[in-house]
């Protein structure tokens, strides 16, 4: 009973935090504490923090953060974006699957690709995936606020970047954070 209660309390806490941040983003009240940051180091830290969750679920988490990616941004908010992308990939990947996180420079931008072997996202759901409170038509078993990707995309936009999606049902998804 205690583990279930702890899990539910954690969900309510995350929901409250997400609602608060979403409201602040909507009202343009989020200020970035910008400085030089190393996107590959932030990515490595997030992946390290998610390793136990992936192992517990039976998901292999692979990382390739060897490419130096200096960016100008708010390290806390960048970690928040990466945390959302990596934990989503773990949640939507079945046991025995794999999540791969790769840092690379592409077309003069710093990019982090988070690719999973999960269920994928139906083409009709893809245009709405960054919308507030959105859940895919196939998502019936995951606790979610429906705000994580919205918040991640809005934070990426504050950094003058974006999150791109490539997905195929039954084959998985790839979310790519790209920053100038």
Report residues per predicted region.
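Short alpha-helical segment of the dimerization/phosphotransfer core of two-component systems
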Residues: 7-12
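Helix-loop junction within the histidine kinase core
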Residues: 23-34
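Bergerat-fold ATP-binding/catalytic subdomain of histidine kinases
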Residues: 25, 128-139
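Conserved catalytic submotifs in the C-terminal HATPase_c
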Residues: 33-38, 55, 60-70
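Short helix N-cap motif at coil->helix boundaries in the Bergerat
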Residues: 39, 120-128
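Short helix-loop "hinge" at the ATP-lid/N-box region of the Bergerat-fold HATPase_c
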Residues: 89-90
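Conserved glycine-rich
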Residues: 160-161
